[in-house]
Amino acid sequence: MQEIIIQVMNQFGYFGVAFLIMIENIFPPIPSEVILTFGGFMTTYSELGIIGMIIAATIGSVLGALILYFVGRLLSVERLEKLVSGRLGKVLRLKPEDITKAEKWFLKRGYATIFFCRFIPLIRSLISIPAGSAKMKLPSFLILTTLGTLIWNIVLVCLGAALGDNWEMIAGILDSYSSVVVVILGIIFILAILIFVKKRFFPKNKNYSSDTEK
C-alpha cells in the first residue's frame, strides 16, 4: 500500500495528497503518517512547498471528516454498527465496537473531543460519526476539525521535511504509537466495564454498615 501511496503523490502532487488524506479519513487502514511524512520529504526534492502540502492535507482531512459527519446525520449509531458487523466492516477493518467507542468518547467529553481526537489513531476518523448523529452544529464541527487536523498535518509534514530520506522512521514510530494507543484504549474500555459492573451489581450497602456500627 505504501508504494501505491507514493506513486499517487509523485504523480498528482497536491491533488494526490488531498485525495489520499480524504480517503484516509473514510478508510482508516490507510496510514496518514506515511502520506504526511512522505509529503514533507517531497518538498525537499520537488517544486511542492511545505505550506501547500499542509493546506492540501488539511483540505483532504476536512472533506473526509465532513463525509463521515453527514453519514452520522443520516444513519443512527445502531445502524452503523449493523453495517460494519458484516462484509463492509471487514473491508474497512472496522468492528461495531469501534463505532461504539467513538460515540462514547464524544458523549462523555463533548465538543472538545472533536479537536483532541484528531491526534488519536482510528478514533480521529470515526469521531465525526457521533458528531453528526448528535446533530453538532456544522460551524463548530468545521472549526474544531480544521484546527485539530491542521496541527497534526503541520507536525508530520515538517518532520518529514526535516528528516528527508529518513522520513520512514517517523512513520514507523507513529505506527508503534498507534498500536500502543489502541491497547491503552482497550484497557480503559475494560476497566470502565469492570467499574460499571461493580457499581451496578455490587453496590455498597451503607444502611447495613451504619446499622452494624450501632
Curated annotation (Swiss-Prot):
The keyword Transmembrane applies. It is found in: Cell membrane. InterPro entries: DedA_domain (IPR051311), VTT_dom (IPR032816). It comes from the Bacteria. It is a multi-pass membrane protein. The chain crosses the membrane at residues 48-68, 141-161, 177-197. Keywords: Cell membrane, Membrane, Transmembrane, Transmembrane helix. The keyword Cell membrane applies. One of its GO terms (cellular component) is plasma membrane. It holds the Pfam family VTT_dom. Belongs to the DedA family. This is Alkaline phosphatase-like protein. It comes from Lactococcus lactis subsp. lactis (strain IL1403). The gene is apl.
